[in-house]
Amino acid sequence: MRHRKSGRQLNRNSSHRKAMFSNMASSLVRHEVIKTTLPKAKELRRVVEPLITLAKTDSVANRRLAFARTRDNEVVAKLFNELGPRFAARQGGYTRILKCGFRAGDKAPMAYIELVDRPEAAVEAAAE
């Protein structure tokens, strides 16, 4: 029985799921908006939001925890230098999920997941 088991399986084994969400979290931090399927976006939110909360307090231990989850120094630097200070006053809710129709090949529901309070230049670049 799967009573009280949280998280979606997404037809992947645990190592594949962990790697996928690590890569997706890195992409979201780097680009601040990505397009993916709706269930993946909803699960990604559970990975990215704690990372940003971690980045609000800059310490060596927190940087190491963030690196352990993303395996990317560039992403860790952006988390702690840009996103942590940007979201310092916000108590959670750092991401927004926008539904954007269905994929042509298999009718999978698609969504954009983005960081809220993005700078205007990033918003205009993403729109193009």
From Swiss-Prot:
Any one GO molecular-function label of the UniProt entry: structural constituent of ribosome
Keywords assigned by UniProt, alphabetized: Ribonucleoprotein, Ribosomal protein
SUPFAM superfamilies for this protein: Prokaryotic ribosomal protein L17 (SSF64263)
InterPro entries: Ribosomal_bL17, Ribosomal_bL17_CS, Ribosomal_bL17_sf
One biological process term in Gene Ontology: translation
Superkingdom: Bacteria
Pfam families: Ribosomal_L17
One GO CC annotation: cytosolic large ribosomal subunit
Subunit structure: Part of the 50S ribosomal subunit. Contacts protein L32.
HAMAP family the record matches: Ribosomal_bL17
Family: Belongs to the bacterial ribosomal protein bL17 family.
Protein name (Swiss-Prot/TrEMBL): Large ribosomal subunit protein bL17
Annotated organism of origin: Vibrio cholerae serotype O1 (strain ATCC 39315 / El Tor Inaba N16961)
Gene: rplQ
